[in-house]
Design a protein with these regions (language model features):
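A structural signal for small-residue-enriched, beta-sheet-centric alpha/beta enzyme cores
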Residues: 1, 5, 25-130
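Phosphate-interacting basic helix/loop segments used at nucleotide- and nucleic-acid interfaces
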Residues: 6-28
Length: 130
């Protein structure tokens, strides 16, 4: 049997991978580190981002208006998690493919490393499971 440990700091791992890709290929892509995640009120698992660099983690739409002119009060799109889930579907869970290239999301790629996935964790007072 084999156990694969998660990185202690997945955001730092994503930054190191991003820097290595830039050094080797002269491009600076966004990088995600992901893992399977069980969901409290649903069966099945989904892939979520546990570390990232160079990607908008959350796209906050609060204050914008919807297609009917109503103000959005709660909408915060979990970009990093959605990209992680899409990449997982593209690679096939059992394929042993360690990386996926996702294109067409330039609007979410940032020049700097950004705050990382740690920025999407809830504060303890808002966390129902602590």
């Amino acid at each position: 049997d084999t156990v694969l440990l998660l990185p202690e700091d997945a955001d730092a791992s994503a930054r190191r991978i991003r820097d290595a890709i830039e050094a080797a290929a002269s491009v600076r892509p966004a990088v995600l580190v992901s893992d399977s995640f069980g969901r409290a009120w649903r069966t099945g698992q989904a892939e979520v981002a546990i570390g990232c660099a160079g990607l908008t983690v959350i796209d906050d739409w609060r204050g914008r208006t919807d297609s009917h002119g109503r103000e959005l009060a709660a909408t915060m799109i979990a970009v990093a998690d959605q990209v992680a889930a899409a990449a997982d579907l593209a690679r096939d869970k059992t394929s042993r493919t360690p990386a996926v290239i996702v294109s067409g999301l330039d609007r979410y790629v940032t020049g700097d490393d950004g705050p990382g996935c740690v920025s999407q964790l809830r504060e303890p007072a808002e966390d129902l499971f602590r």
